[in-house]
From Swiss-Prot:
<feature type="compositionally biased region" description="Polar residues">
    <location>
        <begin position="8"/>
        <end position="18"/>
    </location>
</feature>
<dbReference type="InterPro" id="IPR007696">
    <property type="entry name" value="DNA_mismatch_repair_MutS_core"/>
</dbReference>
<dbReference type="Pfam" id="PF00488">
    <property type="entry name" value="MutS_V"/>
</dbReference>
<dbReference type="Pfam" id="PF05188">
    <property type="entry name" value="MutS_II"/>
</dbReference>
<comment type="similarity">
    <text>Belongs to the DNA mismatch repair MutS family.</text>
</comment>
<dbReference type="GO" id="GO:0005524">
    <property type="term" value="F:ATP binding"/>
</dbReference>
<keyword id="KW-0547">Nucleotide-binding</keyword>
<dbReference type="InterPro" id="IPR017261">
    <property type="entry name" value="DNA_mismatch_repair_MutS/MSH"/>
</dbReference>
<keyword id="KW-0234">DNA repair</keyword>
<dbReference type="InterPro" id="IPR045076">
    <property type="entry name" value="MutS"/>
</dbReference>
<dbReference type="InterPro" id="IPR007695">
    <property type="entry name" value="DNA_mismatch_repair_MutS-lik_N"/>
</dbReference>
<dbReference type="GO" id="GO:0003684">
    <property type="term" value="F:damaged DNA binding"/>
</dbReference>
<dbReference type="Pfam" id="PF05192">
    <property type="entry name" value="MutS_III"/>
</dbReference>
<protein>
    <recommendedName>
        <fullName>DNA mismatch repair protein MutS</fullName>
    </recommendedName>
</protein>
<dbReference type="InterPro" id="IPR005748">
    <property type="entry name" value="DNA_mismatch_repair_MutS"/>
</dbReference>
<dbReference type="InterPro" id="IPR007860">
    <property type="entry name" value="DNA_mmatch_repair_MutS_con_dom"/>
</dbReference>
<dbReference type="Pfam" id="PF01624">
    <property type="entry name" value="MutS_I"/>
</dbReference>
Length: 914
């Protein structure tokens, strides 16, 4: 993954002019532009000019290239043309989307007064303009700019330096829904925590970003990283700023946030205020995420298991795509949220499973709910847009439609004996603000415009004065038509038209030849007042037409003013109910996910897993959820189900480890992955692809399946493999599940075998975790003779006339060969190569390689299998020596003191031999 550093973070200021242009000989408008640009030099400036946003200088060059629009010029500066491009205001979202996706920040500069007000300040005064918003990847709210199926998180990453080292915290916000969460982290799990949230933009202090010791972290992030001044993370004023935002007198009783958490929360709030400028989005209070409440999945494991996206970045082929049957945007986001953070508390998992079981028993009810939910509105995002002043009549209609869905579902569920999770949903639905629901139904028209400025969104008969203004406006337009007919008859000009434009208002238009009929007598000249001569037409007005125009303009303007006042009143009432709207929307998502997972379980034949706190891991007839569905779509052979039992066995204190051998293409990697995916699905609260499943809660899941280089950090495939294996060995516990595929294959045979051998021993004797390890080192199968919890299993194959048939069945036992030559034959290698490879293989198998595994067992006692306590003793001894060395300052010692220090170290080593 390549991190996309914010193009506009002053590190690579591609959009800002290399040097600010001088103001000399510039128009007042261009002077204003340069002043505003100077304050927002790290952004592309969208400068409002009538119906366009215009960009100038380097901004224009950059934007024109990215957007594929015409680059032109306007005016000159220092003898050179000023580059300029522009985009229409009504399609600006489309262009913003492209710029944001390319890593740009955009400052939106609007006209804050109309030209008439500017003229009152003087004939040469220009319209006031101000930046009203900074658009960044993590602060989007517009429907066009957002993916309805995923959250749009802005993350702040805080670091606090202490005498003991560094402390970290993360906070993440989706301003489009109001979600606000925070958690503490550690350096070794920062990447995993960031990848779990999957933010669109990360805010860090510039000092942290430029710290060379953390460079590798930022190099691998696949999102925009925006370094900011360290003051954004100031922890001294953090509590004050947080209380100010949420209108609290104190944080006591809310949460006992740590200093890093306070820094991260405050930074998020300050950045939101910095980018939103004129509005404060209604955010939820920061919810602390407990590290132990969710299954820890490290970054490498998330990638290798392809939970949300495949390794090539596609959604198709991922676990999420395979299990998603939701019908709403909120449901899709909740399903994703559950998938990336499975639970570790059996009772909480069972609440979710109870909901699925309920809908499996009540399929008709589930179908009714699905029909009601299908295509339902995204209420949290609609209410956020309304609160931020970016919403329109259709967002208001989304709230009204959402209320209607809640009312229908509340009635539908009222006669059912509900499981706890659905009962909680029903309880929230019971608090529907019926008065507001009724008011929205009565107020909103059936056919709504996109923008409130277009008017016509309030239903007739809702507001008496508005109806009167509309009648006057519409009646006046009818009078215009009658007046046109009257003038045509009086002048005997059948083609006479009364037209309108924004410059002249209403006017009479005739051809140049016909104009003489309006000017040939003094009476006609007095009545028909000349306004404009065109190439082929002349334009006139009359006193009565001017008076009528004034009445129409007043009525139309007043009608729109009244509509906007009603809109603002309704927005205020809606935002007063923001807490209910968010809880209700979350409840709708819970219903959607529960019904969707019930549908998935019925469609795919999944079973309810048994989840407890034991060390059990027993899967009967497990299948890979993604591969199984792919085979069905291809009408291929059905997926071969396999059992997996790593459970605690009689007379053993810890769970089992399986050592899996077998041929290439035999299905080893699929078997490894499917068991990891089954564990994730079970703990996210889903039924699983098996006939039965009993899983003791997994606290940490580690998977090293597949291999790739990390060229950005100068790491080879083998180095990456060793780094990931080190993470597993250093952090796996007895409640963890470890999946390892072909450890040691990236180096020489003997090196690889040695590392794999020692790794299995360590997992067995130190980590005590549940594990499945696949290997081609058949010598390792002999380890089962001395490791009592290690069991050999193999992928079953059949030989038929010299060809190998893969049965994809896992059975007890060990493979004696890998069938690599047979696989090469299937791949189409030349016959001569296959023949030669077969000869070489036979010679090797008959030579000194034979029987190596048992010889190793005989020659190598289990010397490395130290107990955890003995390992801790070694660590303590090293710590004592390290502490002694740390307290020695050679430049400050006299010769006598140096000698005494040396004797002291010698005595320490003697008393604590390693």
């Amino acid at each position: 993954m390549d991190n996309k550093t914010d193009n506009k973070n002053n590190l690579t200021p591609q959009s800002a002019p290399s040097s600010a242009p001088h103001k000399e000989r510039l128009t007042p408008m261009m002077e204003q532009y340069i002043e505003i640009k100077a304050v927002n030099s790290d952004c592309l400036l969208f400068y409002r000019m009538g119906d366009f946003y215009e960009l100038f200088f380097n901004d224009a060059i950059e934007a024109a290239q990215v957007l594929g629009i015409t680059l032109t010029t306007r005016g000159k500066h220092l003898g050179e043309d000023i580059p300029m491009c522009g985009v229409p205001v009504h399609t600006a979202d489309d262009y913003l989307q492209k710029l944001i996706s390319c890593g740009y920040r955009v400052a939106v500069c609007e006209q804050t007064e109309d030209p008439a007000e500017a003229k009152k300040r003087g004939s040469k005064s220009i319209v006031r303009r101000d930046v009203v918003r900074l658009v960044t990847p993590g602060t989007l709210t517009e429907e066009k700019l957002l993916d309805p199926t995923r959250a749009n998180y802005l993350m702040t990453l805080a670091r606090i330096k202490t005498s003991d080292g560094e402390e970290f915290a993360l906070s993440w916000i989706d301003i489009s829904t109001g979600i606000f969460r925070v958690t503490e982290s550690r350096l070794e799990k920062l990447l995993a925590d960031i990848m779990r949230v999957d933010p669109q933009e990360i805010i860090v202090a510039d000092s942290f970003f430029h710290d060379k010791s953390h460079k590798s972290l930022f190099n691998v992030l696949d999102c925009i990283v925006s370094p900011q001044h360290a003051s954004l993370f100031d922890v001294i004023t953090a509590e004050r700023d947080i209380c100010s935002y949420f209108k609290l007198s104190t944080l006591e009783g809310i949460a006992d946030y740590s200093r890093p958490e306070l820094s991260a929360i405050a930074a998020a709030i300050r950045y939101i205020e910095k980018t939103q400028i004129t509005h404060r989005p209604p955010l939820m209070r920061p919810e602390r995420q407990n590290e132990s409440a969710t299954l820890f999945i490290d970054a490498a494991t998330r990638l290798s298991l392809e939970l949300v996206r495949t390794t090539s970045g596609q959604r198709d082929g991922s676990l999420l795509k395979a299990i998603d049957r939701t019908v709403t945007g909120g449901g899709s986001r909740l399903l994703l949220d559950r998938l990336i953070a499975p639970l570790t508390t059996p009772s909480a998992i069972d609440k979710r499973l109870d909901s699925i079981a309920f809908f499996l028993r009540n399929t008709s009810l589930a179908e009714d709910i699905k029909l009601i939910l299908k295509g339902g509105p995204d209420m949290p995002r609609a209410v956020s847009r309304l609160a931020l002043g970016r919403g329109g009549p259709r967002d208001m209609a989304s709230i009204q439609r959402g209320f209607e869905i809640i009312r229908e579902l509340h009635q539908l569920l009222s006669n059912e004996l509900l499981p706890q999770e659905i009962s909680d949903v029903q309880q929230i639905f019971s608090h529907l603000p019926t008065a507001l629901h009724l008011r929205l139904e009565q107020a909103l028209a059936d056919d709504l415009p996109l923008l409130k400025r277009d008017g016509g969104f309030i239903r007739p008969h809702y507001h008496k004065e508005l109806d009167e203004m509309r009648t006057l406006r519409d009646e006046s337009r009818r009078v215009i038509a009658e007046l046109q007919a009257q003038y045509a008859q009086e002048t005997d000009i059948k083609t006479l038209k009364i037209k309108h434009n924004n410059i002249l208002g209403y006017f009479i238009e005739v051809t140049n030849l016909q104009a003489t009929a309006l000017t040939n007598t003094p009476q006609a000249k007095a009545r028909f007042i000349h306004r404009q001569t065109m190439a082929n037409a002349m334009r006139f007005t009359t006193t009565e037409l001017a008076e009528l125009e004034s009445r129409i303009a007043h009525a139309a303007n007043h009608a729109l003013t009244l509509e906007l006042e009603i809109f603002d009143t309704l927005v205020h009432e809606i935002t007063e109910q923001v807490d209910f709207i968010r809880k209700a929307a979350e409840s709708l998502a819970v219903l959607d996910v529960s019904v969707a997972l019930a549908h998935l379980a019925e469609e795919q034949g999944y079973c309810r897993p048994k989840i407890d706190q034991s060390l059990t891991f027993c899967i009967t007839a497990g299948r890979h959820p993604v591969v199984e569905q792919a085979l069905r779509k291809q009408a291929a052979e059905p997926f071969v189900a396999n059992n997996c039992d790593l459970s605690l066995q009689e007379n053993h204190q810890y769970a089992a480890i399986w050592l899996l051998t077998g041929p290439n293409m035999g299905g080893k990697s699929t078997f490894l992955r499917q068991n990891a995916l089954i564990a994730i699905m079970a703990q996210m609260g889903s039924f699983v692809p098996a006939t039965s499943a009993h899983i003791g809660v997994v606290d940490r899941l580690f998977s090293r399946v597949g291999a790739s280089d990390d060229l950005a950090r100068g790491r080879s495939t083998f180095m990456m493999e060793m780094v990931e294996t080190a993470t597993i060995l250093n952090h796996a516990t007895q409640h963890s599940l470890v999946i390892l595929d072909e450890i040691g294959r990236g180096t020489s045979t003997f090196d690889g075998l040695s590392i794999a051998w020692a790794t299995v021993e360590y997992l067995h004797e130190v980590n005590h975790c549940r594990a499945i390890l696949a290997t081609h080192f058949h010598e390792m199968t002999a380890l089962t003779e001395k490791l009592d919890r290690l069991h050999n299993v193999t992928m079953k194959v059949k030989n038929w006339d010299g060809d190998v048939i893969f049965l994809h069945e896992v059975t007890p036992g060990a493979a004696d060969r890998s069938y690599g030559v047979q696989v090469a034959k299937l791949a189409g290698l030349p016959k001569a190569v296959i023949t030669r490879a077969t000869d070489v293989l036979q010679q090797l198998e008959q030579g000194e390689m034979a029987g190596k595994g048992h010889k190793l067992i005989d020659d190598l006692p289990l010397f490395s299998l130290k107990t955890t306590s003995s390992l801790n003793e070694d660590t303590n001894k090293y710590s004592m020596l390290h502490e002694a060395f740390k307290n020695i300052h050679p430049d400050e010692l006299s010769p006598k003191q140096a000698l005494e220090a040396l004797y002291h170290l010698k005595q320490l080593e003697k008393n604590n031999p390693l």
